[in-house]
Amino acid sequence: MSKRIPFVGLHAHSGLSLNDGLGYPQDHMDFALHNGGNALALTDHGHMNGLPYQVLHAKKLKANGDNFKPIFGVEAYFLPSLDIWREQYEKAKNEKKKVERDISLSIEDEKASKQKVTNILRKRNHLILLAQNQTGLNNIFKLVSESYKDDNFYRYPRMDYNLLSQYSDGVIA
């Protein structure tokens, strides 16, 4: 039998991260535990729906004599500025409308026009946020909730520096 090497995984996707994860949160925790880990951060895309599974399974492990710490977090969809993103989107949308109005005067490359708007809509980066303490967990809950509001959401829940700075206490980014 090989010697286990202690580790803590700080970025794992469960099956709750559609098209990017596999298994239930409990499966990830069990795998980590059986391979030398005593903690694991579940960081699903844009939400924390696996948190209840983490809490319940950690209690089950503790009752069985295993000391395993779930680390609560999220892989956020992050942009430097949501205001700039909205402006770019509106500008691209208006340019597309202008081209559509002027279609009788010129021939539009429809695919290129759609691609320009689509690229702006899909623009995002990934940022791992981990809760350092209860305050951090509460702040991540607020960040995730804010990212799903209409102004921040188009296919993906987004957050930016302004939002992150409002709710940064106890959050490791």
Task: Give the positions of each predicted feature.
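Phosphodiester-processing cores and adjacent nucleic acid-binding clamps
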Residues: 1-173
